[in-house]
Amino acid sequence: MEQAPEDQGPQREPYNEWTLELLEELKREAVRHFPRPWLHGLGQHIYETYGDTWTGVEAIIRILQRLLFVHFRIGCQHSRIGILRQRRARNGASRS
């Protein structure tokens, strides 16, 4: 009968500790790019929906990751990552 291999690798950081560190990092980044009252409202919504649970922590992590991804993808003025918007010529000469 097959058996799962023994875990011989280095001890991984506990999930809860890693998750809280990730949340803190995302919050620090989000504050640099979004208004504090807006982020506070998001936090209140998550708290009212999930309470003080790990499900709420995971939900706000997912939301902040998506918001920051889209924000950078659209073209954050603080970042070199993103879509470069080019002005189009009115006469259509730049079309190929």
Curated annotation (Swiss-Prot):
Swiss-Prot/TrEMBL keywords: Activator, AIDS, Apoptosis, Cell cycle, Host G2/M cell cycle arrest by virus, Host nucleus, Host-virus interaction, Ion channel, Ion transport, Modulation of host cell cycle by virus, Phosphoprotein, Transcription, Transcription regulation, Transport, Viral penetration into host nucleus, Virion, Virus entry into host cell
Residue numbers carrying Phosphoserine: 79, 94, 96
UniProt-listed Pfam families: VPR
Gene3D superfamilies found in the cross-reference section: 6.10.210.10, VpR/VpX protein, C-terminal domain (1.20.5.90)
Family: Belongs to the HIV-1 VPR protein family.
More details: HIV-1 lineages are divided in three main groups, M (for Major), O (for Outlier), and N (for New, or Non-M, Non-O). The vast majority of strains found worldwide belong to the group M. Group O seems to be endemic to and largely confined to Cameroon and neighboring countries in West Central Africa, where these viruses represent a small minority of HIV-1 strains. The group N is represented by a limited number of isolates from Cameroonian persons. The group M is further subdivided in 9 clades or subtypes (A to D, F to H, J and K).
Subunit annotation: Homooligomer, may form homodimer. Interacts with p6-gag region of the Pr55 Gag precursor protein through a (Leu-X-X)4 motif near the C-terminus of the P6gag protein. Interacts with host UNG. May interact with host RAD23A/HHR23A. Interacts with host VPRBP/DCAF1, leading to hijack the CUL4A-RBX1-DDB1-DCAF1/VPRBP complex, mediating ubiquitination of host proteins such as TERT and ZGPAT and arrest of the cell cycle in G2 phase.
Protein name: Protein Vpr
Biological classification of the source: Viruses, Riboviria, Pararnavirae, Artverviricota, Revtraviricetes
Name of encoding gene: vpr
